[in-house]
Amino acid sequence: MGNEEAFTFALAMATGSFANMVLRAVVELDVFEIMKRAGPGTHLSAAEIAAHLPTKNPDANAMLDRMLRVLAGYEVLSCSNRSLPNGQVERLYGLSPVSQFFTKSEDGASLAPLCLLNQDKVYWESWYHLKDAVLDGGIAFNRAHNLTLYEYAGIDDRFNKVFNDGMSGCSTTIMKKMVENYKGFEGVSTLVDVAGGIGKNLNMIISKYPTIKGINFDLPHVIKDAPRCRGVENIGGDMFISVPQGDAIFIKWICCDWNDEHCLKFLKNCYAALPDHGKVILYEFIFPKASETSYAARVILNIDAVTLATVVGGRIRTEAEFEALAKGAGFEGFKMAYSTSEVDAVMEFLKKK
């Protein structure tokens, strides 16, 4: 990288958070859904989009155009020009392959709620305390709010919903591919989803495997928002104390929230809840073996940074580190079962080989 390119890259890093905040505002304004309703391949001007917004602000068109231009620069939107009769040029915007993921799929899934979560004031405040956490110890989120992330979610209904929506929206997008391709749920009688949130993961699994009895297990303040679904029992509790019994236990994106000591504690509880032929099906982000400057690696590094700022001892692990957790919790078998992308993996912890 030459000096000029390095300087430009440094500027991009110094200003990079602005684009994320523009993206958040565009999501809040429902712009992507407005564009989607216009039909496939349609390109709209900022004025045409703004006409669907509840605003009388005379500057809204110009402001929105500048925001959409930012997203086009990041290839979140496509952009073309249209010549007007008065000789001026008007920019037209369309959905790109990237922005499709910020619109709702047939099952209502979208990455838009994850964007709102990651730029939420409650989350964002953590970053202002990261320096002090490095110097003086502690967790940035805890220093900002005097509570852990999960304690805070338990007392703030607004943030609890933002958190659950952000997790479930992203989860549904990824889980759909996993359920279609991973075959390890075949033959399972009772499946316990530990820290299953509001139950979307379990519902997707049972929709394909209707003979499975599902148990959605999470903290009581999370379970209270879980809808009732056929074939699923919602149980409130604490995975660090005990876990409901089943012949398979599903855990997704939980180990990344905890240090090894805490992971071993709930994994040992899972071990105790399983019969000899049982298994834990662990779906986690994992450090890719490829270059750490790839898009996939940057996603994982960003997620690792979030866990650093918000949870006690949380981090992204390597395959070898997951195998060490399995063996440390007493499981005799470990295997990499399936991967939906470069950044995640489905692993099986087998109680007995």
UniProtKB/Swiss-Prot annotation:
Q: Which SUPFAM superfamilies match?
A: S-adenosyl-L-methionine-dependent methyltransferases, Winged helix' DNA-binding domain
Keyword set, alphabetical order: Alkaloid metabolism, Methyltransferase, S-adenosyl-L-methionine, Transferase
Reply yes or no: does the keyword Isomerase apply.
no
An individual GO BP term: methylation
Expressed, tissue-wise, as follows: Expressed at high levels in all tissues.
Which GO terms label this protein's molecular function in UniProt? Answer: O-methyltransferase activity; protein dimerization activity
| Temperature-dependent activity | Optimum temperature is 45 degrees Celsius.
Reaction catalyzed: 3-methoxytyramine + S-adenosyl-L-methionine = N-methyl-3-methoxytyramine + S-adenosyl-L-homocysteine + H(+); mescaline + S-adenosyl-L-methionine = N-methylmescaline + S-adenosyl-L-homocysteine + H(+); tyramine + S-adenosyl-L-methionine = N-methyltyramine + S-adenosyl-L-homocysteine + H(+); 4-hydroxy-3,5-dimethoxyphenethylamine + S-adenosyl-L-methionine = N-methyl-4-hydroxy-3,5-dimethoxyphenethylamine + S-adenosyl-L-homocysteine + H(+)
Q: Which residues bind S-adenosyl-L-methionine?
A: D218
Per the record, pH dependence is:
Optimum pH is 9.
**Gene3D superfamilies the UniProt entry points to:** Vaccinia Virus protein VP39, Winged helix-like DNA-binding domain superfamily/Winged helix DNA-binding domain
Pathway(s) this gene product operates in, as recorded in its UniProt entry: Aromatic compound metabolism; Alkaloid biosynthesis
Q: Which positions does UniProt annotate for S-adenosyl-L-homocysteine binding? A: S171, A195, D218, D238, K252
A Pfam family name for this chain?
Answer: Dimerisation
Role this protein plays: N-methyltransferase participating in the biosynthesis of natural products derived from phenylethylamine, including mescaline, a natural hallucinogen potentially used in psychotherapeutic treatments. Catalyzes the N-methylation of many substrates, including 3-methoxytyramine, 5-hydroxy-3,4-dimethoxyphenethylamine, 4-hydroxy-3,5-dimethoxyphenethylamine, tyramine and mescaline.
Q: How does it assemble?
A: Homodimer.
Supply the name of the protein.
Answer: N-methyltransferase
Please give the organism: Lophophora williamsii (Peyote)
